[in-house]
């Protein structure tokens, strides 16, 4: 998602001045009749103030905690979100959808030993890792460097039946995070192809943090795969490079199973004049379970709940219906938003826009418009009232990796909030993803930006039509969307027709 690194500091006074200046200037010219300028000022001003949003984030992170889909804490998060919406006077329901498979870690441990040495570094199973046999799995530990093709060629047949230890760079930013994902595809394919017993990644995070990355092949994976704390992995690597043979015994106990039912939480403020037209504001409720899930994605869940709360409190009535969608199953493949698209298929022609906010707590500096150039001026127009919180740059490339995906594949105009990296990269899916990673002022400013965007799309006269499958296919041919989908193991579902807008039926002429 490649957020930029523009620095941004301000005081509360400067924030207020910037907002007022923006509204008196450009926004005044763009305001439509009927008090829209006043309404957006009321909304953004409220969101910048002392609302319950930050306390909601603390409650979700500290009291509910990590929220892996299928877990008891995830079920509690659904009840938590419903209670927050209803307490704000916002109608809300939980909507069921089908998760294709259950995967939860129950416990993970490892012991490394060789002549005269034995130690037990901490490990975390990677999502979609297989479990080890009862009692654990012991195998030689083999140093394969960075896991490049040349590294596997160097060690040759030694890979077969061994745990391969993969060296990583220490991760400092989002660019490094996406490099990890890209490199893992080749590393894991080479390891499995050579007959490795399993894959052990040296932890890349500062401070010996453990974290979870999905195995690159997802549920098709056939090997135990894990992350080992950085210091322990470096020690093992030094011993191996000193010529000391090592064996590792890993014990990964998992809770796995077939398809099951999970739930999204959908709050709604019904449109006053065009209720059949819908603006979807989405943030995923689930998180991985090592940390509390503040950056990914509790902060943006709290933000959307507060946006709904302030709209209701102020009595603002949008022309279009606004749905506040707290998705589940995002971390395992965006299954909650896919389920919504399937269950609301008959309504999608009326969906004006679907937004995903999912890149942490850094400042929103624009939006991905995902291959829909006509969206750019509409986003620019909606953001005029909060121009003082910018600058904002819209990026018109399709992005895969969050809950805009199934809307994009179904032809609905869709956006992703682009955000500065801030503390996102090193704490992504990590034990350190806790409440302290988020800055309250930035979170409030982001809420104002999303509030202005939402109000703009819910009230403006313009609306982009839904695209057909042929137009989505044209986007795939013109961009790297196909490659992105393949890297996330999503392409087969598109080809099979289980995701995306179905092809238009060809009507045969009636014989005369």
Q: PLM ranges: what are they?
A:
Residues 36-71, 97, 209-215, 286-287, ...:
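N-terminal capping segment at the start of a domain
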Residues 37-39, 123-156, 215-294, 306-309, ...:
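Soluble metallo-hydrolase cores and metallopeptidase-like ectodomains found primarily
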Residues 11-22:
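Bacterial N-terminal signal peptides
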């Amino acid at each position: 998602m490649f957020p930029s690194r523009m620095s941004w500091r301000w005081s509360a006074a400067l924030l207020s001045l910037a907002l007022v200046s923006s509204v008196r200037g450009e926004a005044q010219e763009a305001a439509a009749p009927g008090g829209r300028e006043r309404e957006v000022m009321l909304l953004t001003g409220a969101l910048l103030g002392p609302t319950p949003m930050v306390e909601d984030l603390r409650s979700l992170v500290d009291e509910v905690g990590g929220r892996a889909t299928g877990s008891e804490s995830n079920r509690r998060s659904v009840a938590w979100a419903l209670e927050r919406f209803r307490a704000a006077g916002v109608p809300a329901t939980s909507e069921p959808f089908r998760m294709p498979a259950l995967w939860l870690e129950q416990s993970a441990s490892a012991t490394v030993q060789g002549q005269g040495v034995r130690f037990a570094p901490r490990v975390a199973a990677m999502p979609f890792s297989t479990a080890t046999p009862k009692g654990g799995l012991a195998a030689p530990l083999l140093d394969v460097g960075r896991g490049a093709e040349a590294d596997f060629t160097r060690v040759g047949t030694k890979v077969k039946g061994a745990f391969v230890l993969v060296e990583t760079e220490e991760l400092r930013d989002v660019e490094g995070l996406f490099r990890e994902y890209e490199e893992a595809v080749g590393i894991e394919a080479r390891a499995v192809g050579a007959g490795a017993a399993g894959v052990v990644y040296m932890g890349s995070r500062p401070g010996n943090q453990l974290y979870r990355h999905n195995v690159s092949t997802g549920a098709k994976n056939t090997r135990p795969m894990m992350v080992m704390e950085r210091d322990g992995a470096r020690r093992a690597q030094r011993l191996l490079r000193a010529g000391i043979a090592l064996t590792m015994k890993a014990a990964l106990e998992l809770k796995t199973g077939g398809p099951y039912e999970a739930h999204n939480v959908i709050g709604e403020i019904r449109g006053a004049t065009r209720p059949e037209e819908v603006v979807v504001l989405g943030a995923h409720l689930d998180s991985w379970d090592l940390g509390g899930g503040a950056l990914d994605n509790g902060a943006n869940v709290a933000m959307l709940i507060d946006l709904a709360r302030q709209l209701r409190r102020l009595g603002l009535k949008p022309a279009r219906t606004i749905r506040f969608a707290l998705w589940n199953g995002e971390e395992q493949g965006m299954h909650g938003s896919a389920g919504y698209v399937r269950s609301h298929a008959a309504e999608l022609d009326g969906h004006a826009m679907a937004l995903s906010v999912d890149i942490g707590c850094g400042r929103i500096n624009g939006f991905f418009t995902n291959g829909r150039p006509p969206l750019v001026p509409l986003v620019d127009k909606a953001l005029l009232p909060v121009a003082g919180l910018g600058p904002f740059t819209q990026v018109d490339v399709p992005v895969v990796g969050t809950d805009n995906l199934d809307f994009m594949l179904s032809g609905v105009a869709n956006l992703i909030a682009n955000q500065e990296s801030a503390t996102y990269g090193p704490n992504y899916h990590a034990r350190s993803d806790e409440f302290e990673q988020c800055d309250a002022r930035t979170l409030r400013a982001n809420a104002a930006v999303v509030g202005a965007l939402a109000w703009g799309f819910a009230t403006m006269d313009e609306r982009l039509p839904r695209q057909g499958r042929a137009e989505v296919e044209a986007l795939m041919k013109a961009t790297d969307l196909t490659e992105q989908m393949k890297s996330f193991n999503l392409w087969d579902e598109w080809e099979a027709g289980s995701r995306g807008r179905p092809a238009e039926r060809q009507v045969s002429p009636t014989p005369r």
